[in-house]
Amino acid sequence: QQFSLYPDLTVMENLTFYARIYGIPRRNRRARIEEVIAGAGIQDYRKRLAGQLSGGWKQRLALACALVHRPRLMFLDEPTAGIDPVARRELWNLLFDLSGQGVTFFVTTHYMDEAERCSHVGYIYFSKLIVCGTPNELKQLDEISPPGTARLEVRCPRLPSAMRILAEKPYVDDVTIFADSLHVLAEQGSEHRISADLEAAGYPQTQVIPIPPTLEDVFVTLTQRRKAV
């Protein structure tokens, strides 16, 4: 994901170059460039060399160059890789604005929170599309939470050792650390068993809460099942 524009040209010069490459007539060129500059929010950087921009502003410039000829479909390969959280959110807000104007985006990402923002999500594993649907459709797949099971969030101290304890229980199918808690796939109605087993192992006041699966749960479950085949 290297910066693909010309670092020794200014923002305006890069946009002018791409407008000419895409065949935008001279009489319309300046107006269209000003439109994409405003849309990408890079008005204050017209004369800045592209190579001197931060990661987030480089991505905005790259998007502006790609939009200058009014495409209806765009492919974005990890567009937020290497940029800070604020720039990442601002870039996604820009993509939503463009989507509302009729532009369709195909986005590749390793960030599951970004996948949650998409209308449809496809998982590719070893170059094969293994599933595709809306985020809600994927979370409701029987393969993700098989009948008779439930996904639970377990809040307790010493997560690594608690995870090892639960992983050995016959009623637990899967357990992983997720931020400051454990995500557990277990038999339905096993909340009290989890609390009792952890309390017996020295974990008082354990909280066990039913939760819906996340897209990360979907991704991990699907890939693990295929690794086991």
Feature-to-residue mapping (PLM):
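Conserved ABC ATPase "signature" region
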Residues: 16, 20, 27-45
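Hydrophobic anchor residue at the start of the ABC signature
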Residues: 63
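Conserved catalytic motifs of ABC-family nucleotide-binding domains
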Residues: 70
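Catalytic Walker B motif of ABC-type/P-loop ATPase nucleotide-binding domains
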Residues: 74-77
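ABC transporter nucleotide-binding domain
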Residues: 93-186
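C-terminal coupling/interaction segments
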Residues: 161, 185-229
